[in-house]
């Protein structure tokens, strides 16, 4: 199973990816985790990424695409993977399609978790309150103003992926506002049609 989960910050992509990973035994591939691992391993591409990040710049699509390509080749991805935070742009999606095709692979589905943005802000606020109540650390960008900026960035940069994947016929849209169990069940129905 090769899957992309789309949706704005706070839509529940990480929650769903975690549940699917546990059930199907395939890895969740997070761009941030892959970048950090490449830097820690001091691979050639990791060194290039580190130099860019140390300069306070965004890592180029070329570097991110190469890191993703290398990660997909790892043995634990032989039976599939769930991409989280990649692709973020249409050019990255096009590169992913070419990359997978070159490996003789294709995506099984691109699932978009459709959510109401105002409800997302409330969801974020309650997640912060729960984290604080449990004595946990809160992300510096987990406040309404920063969260709304992340939503705007998502709309501008990542939301066009919906149109792109609708055009390829791979997009499936589900209600991300439903309870977690219902969202999971709907994803399973898409992945394993009756």
Swiss-Prot record:
The keyword Nucleotide-binding applies. It is found in: Cytoplasm. Residues 126-142 are annotated as: LID. AMP binds at residues 31, 36, 57-59, 85-88, 92, 139, 150. Consists of three domains, a large central CORE domain and two small peripheral domains, NMPbind and LID, which undergo movements during catalysis. The LID domain closes over the site of phosphoryl transfer upon ATP binding. Assembling and dissambling the active center during each catalytic cycle provides an effective means to prevent ATP hydrolysis. Belongs to the adenylate kinase family. Monomer. This is Adenylate kinase. It comes from Brucella canis (strain ATCC 23365 / NCTC 10854 / RM-666).
């Amino acid at each position: 199973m090769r899957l992309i989960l789309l949706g704005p910050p706070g839509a529940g992509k990480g929650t769903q990816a975690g549940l699917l990973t546990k059930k199907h035994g395939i890895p969740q591939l997070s761009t941030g985790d892959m970048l950090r691992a490449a830097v820690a391993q001091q691979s050639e591409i990791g060194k290039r990424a580190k130099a860019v990040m140390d300069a306070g710049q965004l890592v180029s699509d070329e570097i991110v695409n190469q890191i993703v390509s290398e990660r997909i080749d790892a043995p634990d991805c032989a039976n599939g993977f769930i991409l989280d935070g990649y692709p973020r742009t249409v050019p990255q999606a096009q590169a992913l399609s070419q990359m997978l095709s070159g490996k003789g692979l294709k995506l099984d589905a691109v699932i978009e978790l459709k959510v109401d943005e105002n409800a997302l802000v409330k969801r974020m606020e309650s997640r912060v309150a729960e984290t604080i109540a449990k004595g946990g650390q809160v992300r510096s960008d987990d406040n309404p103003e920063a969260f709304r900026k992340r939503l705007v960035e998502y709309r501008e940069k990542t939301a066009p992926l919906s149109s792109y994947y609708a055009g390829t016929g791979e997009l499936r849209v589900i209600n991300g506002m439903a309870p977690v169990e219902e969202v999971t069940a709907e994803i399973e129905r898409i992945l394993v049609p009756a």
